[in-house]
Amino acid sequence: MEGVSATMHKLRPYLLMIFLQFGAAGTYIVIMATLNQGQNRYVVIVYRNLVAALVLAPFALIFERKVRPKMTLSVLWKIMALGFLEPVLDQGFGYLGMNMTSATYTSAIMNILPSVTFIIAWILRMEKVNIAEVRSKAKIIGTLVGLGGALVMTLYKGPLIPLPWSNPNMDQQNGHTNNSQDHNNWVVGTLLILLGCVAWSGFYVLQSITIKTYPADLSLSALICLAGAVQSFAVALVVERHPSGWAVGWDARLFAPLYTGIVSSGITYYVQGMVMKTRGPVFVTAFNPLCMILVALIASFILHEQIHFGCVIGGAVIAAGLYMVVWGKGKDYEVSGLDILEKNSLQELPITTKSEDDNKLVSSISDNSNVTIPGGAHSNTSGI
């Protein structure tokens, strides 16, 4: 019995991350279904982030009551900027691009997020790069490979891949319709998704700065969602003036904000943070390509989306680039941990307890890390 318990304890992080990827895949599906029903994307964003703020706020008030720092004008401006970058720009561009392409395509493109974050952090001198080191080469090459995969998906669609549950007549009809439409829609949709990805990466960079002066994860995430809901509401009032556009019924228009607010922000935030504490951000990010596969299968079955050969090839290339970047970043964490451990062994008294050493090591690594990999401990997890 103890052996079974020990095995389940070892498997728990893997099972939890697989569960989260199913939840993330569901986000793409329900959002796409809502957009297909004609719901304005900014109305969806308002409801989604409002639900997320309501879900996170009680936990923030209870668990961070004694550790929440005082709000300053500087932190407030950063929170407003974070709410504009992630909910307004990222989700706004991402949803529009998804509507022009597909949920499968969007989930594949979004795997270049770590690469884009690396580029922005490097430009801002927040990411150290040494060409002589293998880990830096891995991050650079992985970034180029990921961008190359996105380029392949943009320029090459390729033939349709027949699936056992697909309807050949429907695939032929949809393919004919797509050929008759302006191909620029596909390119424009890709550019919009990439713009959303850049905004999301900028969000992670700014969040890594903000968390140093406001180290209350739950409170910060709740405030970001609230700021995003308020700013999205202002945009939505301009683009959607008819009251009927704000109406929700017992369909995807009601289910989408509830699902994304509770699952994508509430449950995902808690589970992701719990796994990150024991296995690190690289472990969390490494499961992202599974979401792409799940979206492709579920969307083709429920939404009758087509899967093109170019999407498969490009997605595989992007996934390869993703793993190269997270491998290089993982080596950064290992080196950082060894440096801190060596420094502590030289500066501290030789007699300490194991728990004190562990706490100092974790605290030091947290204080000296640069930009958290997307999906890490400081992730708001309320993206697309």
UniProtKB/Swiss-Prot annotation:
<feature type="transmembrane region" description="Helical">
    <location>
        <begin position="307"/>
        <end position="327"/>
    </location>
</feature>
<feature type="transmembrane region" description="Helical">
    <location>
        <begin position="43"/>
        <end position="63"/>
    </location>
</feature>
<dbReference type="GO" id="GO:0016020">
    <property type="term" value="C:membrane"/>
</dbReference>
<feature type="domain" description="EamA 2">
    <location>
        <begin position="198"/>
        <end position="326"/>
    </location>
</feature>
<keyword id="KW-0677">Repeat</keyword>
<keyword id="KW-1133">Transmembrane helix</keyword>
<feature type="transmembrane region" description="Helical">
    <location>
        <begin position="15"/>
        <end position="35"/>
    </location>
</feature>
<keyword id="KW-0472">Membrane</keyword>
<feature type="transmembrane region" description="Helical">
    <location>
        <begin position="255"/>
        <end position="275"/>
    </location>
</feature>
<protein>
    <recommendedName>
        <fullName>WAT1-related protein At4g08290</fullName>
    </recommendedName>
</protein>
<feature type="transmembrane region" description="Helical">
    <location>
        <begin position="104"/>
        <end position="124"/>
    </location>
</feature>
<comment type="similarity">
    <text>Belongs to the drug/metabolite transporter (DMT) superfamily. Plant drug/metabolite exporter (P-DME) (TC 2.A.7.4) family.</text>
</comment>
<dbReference type="InterPro" id="IPR030184">
    <property type="entry name" value="WAT1-related"/>
</dbReference>
<feature type="transmembrane region" description="Helical">
    <location>
        <begin position="73"/>
        <end position="93"/>
    </location>
</feature>
<feature type="transmembrane region" description="Helical">
    <location>
        <begin position="282"/>
        <end position="302"/>
    </location>
</feature>
<dbReference type="Pfam" id="PF00892">
    <property type="entry name" value="EamA"/>
</dbReference>
<dbReference type="InterPro" id="IPR000620">
    <property type="entry name" value="EamA_dom"/>
</dbReference>
<feature type="transmembrane region" description="Helical">
    <location>
        <begin position="140"/>
        <end position="160"/>
    </location>
</feature>
<feature type="transmembrane region" description="Helical">
    <location>
        <begin position="186"/>
        <end position="206"/>
    </location>
</feature>
<feature type="domain" description="EamA 1">
    <location>
        <begin position="25"/>
        <end position="154"/>
    </location>
</feature>
<keyword id="KW-0812">Transmembrane</keyword>
<feature type="transmembrane region" description="Helical">
    <location>
        <begin position="219"/>
        <end position="239"/>
    </location>
</feature>
<dbReference type="GO" id="GO:0022857">
    <property type="term" value="F:transmembrane transporter activity"/>
</dbReference>
